[in-house]
Amino acid sequence: MEKLPKKRVSKTKSQKLIHSLTTQKNRAFLKKISANEMLLELEKGAFKKNEAYFISDEEDKNYVLVPDNVISLLAENARKAFEARLRAELERDIITQAPIDFEDVREVSLQLLENLRQKDGNLPNINTLNFVKQIKKEHPNLFFNFDNMFKQPPFNENNFENFDNSDEENF
């Protein structure tokens, strides 16, 4: 299938399309004429190039016909929504790993995420928590290390055997 050029839909055209989708004002019937031919008969509404059409066939199957630029726009919006959700999850998981500077960690993670962008331009669906944990392993200087901060050496009586009480008398 050939790739169609991307066309932008203006606000008023978008509004008309949304209106035609919600009202289902354009209805048509699809009738088979021969093995290679079908007749599309408009039952309600009018033919307008930037509106959707709801089509029923002889077997009561329903279809929706929309302009090609609308499908491209829907796909682009779905991609943007996915990437926004991925970035939000990434930011949430960065916070759970106690970054020293959130902005630094976010920039590093976004650069590494961009390196994963596929040939088709899409980002892969990743486990963002594991992704951030891997960044923490590779760049520990970007995160607080609470394990080492609060560790105290274990109590050992041998450390106090040679303690000389004579110093106490000088106080």
From Swiss-Prot:
Family membership: Belongs to the UPF0763 family.
Protein name as annotated: UPF0763 protein HP_0664
